[in-house]
Amino acid sequence: ENKIITDLLSLVKMDKKAADVNITHMDINQLLEDILKRLRPIADKRNIDLILDCFRPVDADVDEVKFTLAISNLVENGIKYNVDDGWVRVSLDADHKYFYITVADSGMGIPEDSIERIFERFYRVDKSHSKEIGGTGLGLAITKSSIAMHHGTIKVFSKEGEGTTFSVRIPLSYIPS
C-alpha cells in the first residue's frame, strides 16, 4: 500500500509541466555501480548475477534522483521477473552526443501482445502472479516519464521465454525545454 502511494506521488510530480528537475553533472559509471551494489542483495537471494559493462567513462547531466529511480526500476524488474540462477546485464556506452544504457535479463520475457502496453500505468503483464511477485504496475510508467524528462528515449525488445532488453538513450548535456 505504501509503495503504491509513493509511486503515485512520483508520477504526479513528473506529470507536472514544471516538474522540479535538479540537473547535476554526474559520473554515470559510478551511479550505475551504486545502483547495482544496492540491488545485489536482492539478486543474491535468487542467485542472479548482476553484471555491469562500462565501455568508457561517461559524465552527463542528469537529475540524480529521477535517473537512479528509472534505472533501478529496470534492474529490479530484471531481477523480479527472472529465473533463479539467471543474470541481469547493465551496459553503458556513449558517443559525442548521447549515452546509452541497456538492461538485459535472462528472465521470462514479455508476450508480444503486451509489449506496447507495459509503459501504461497499472498495466501488469501477468495479473495472476501479481501478489507473489509484488509491485504496483507503475514502475515502468515512472521510468518512461523520468527518461522523457531527461529528453531521452526508452525501447524494449523481448521474446517470451528468452528475456528482455531495455535500451535507454539520454543526451549527455541537458537542455531545458
Where are these regions (language model features)?
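Conserved catalytic submotifs in the C-terminal HATPase_c
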Residues: N22-H25, D44-K45, D49-D59
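Short helix-loop "hinge" at the ATP-lid/N-box region of the Bergerat-fold HATPase_c
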Residues: G78-I79
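Short beta-strand/loop element within the Bergerat-fold HATPase_c
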Residues: D85-K97
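Acidic ATP/Mg2+-coordinating residue in the GHKL
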Residues: D105
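Short conserved segment of the HATPase_c
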Residues: I110-R124
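Short alpha-helical Gxxx[C/S/T] motif in the catalytic ATP-binding
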Residues: G134, G139, T143
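Conserved glycine-rich
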Residues: H151-T153
